[in-house]
Amino acid sequence: MQWQQRDALWLLAPTQAKGVIQFIGGSGLGATPQLSYRRLLEAMAQRGWLVQCWSYLPGFDHQLLAVQAWRGFRSQRQEQLPVLRLGHSMGCKLHLLAPDQGRGAQAEVLLSFNNFAADRSIPLLGELAPRLGVTSEFSPGPDETLRIINSQLPQRPRLLIRFRDDQLDQSRQLLRFLPGGEAFNELQQLGGDHLTPASAGLRQQWLGGLGDGPRQRELNRLAEAIEQWWQQRGD
């Protein structure tokens, strides 16, 4: 399998696809998802998924980014295949803000959901903005994002995954606002930290077998957790 680019999308297609993964990575990492998330996405492709990942540069208007991502995926839609939306960190937020409210997918998997304010996400902004007399916040901001999630999203299968050593994760807060709450949405905890999904495998590439280790095992468990949940979920 070889990565192919279609405008802002990077595609990885197995010989026979059983479904489509629409992936959005985190802020910064999402600019080159085919590199930053290579091992996870290739593991999913090896399990029979057609992987589509959207590349983007971070900005303050998250609603605009969400619309752009949705349009990008829509331009490459495979109507005969089921769709799983997969996001990491800020990518979770962008999927949840999609203009179709998730109706274009059968399910969503959200890794390390993050919904911090701009001054928390960009520490220097918190220091400079008061001095410059300006205020900058993501649109929508954290509170408005949760209100949109709670009031506009339909109830559908969603898997939230947090990592044991992740200090940035807000999955538990998200679970309280998702339609259906804990009764309908599942939260799993795996070993790792906030960057576990983004392990690119550079050590393995440079060092061969010496590069294998905890990161690879964490990624294998993550890919398997996603696959098992997809197979067991209720439609």
Describe these PLM feature segments.
Residues 199-235:
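Catalytic active-site module of serine/aspartate enzymes centered on a nucleophile-bearing elbow/loop
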Residues 59-80:
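Alpha/beta-hydrolase active-site loop
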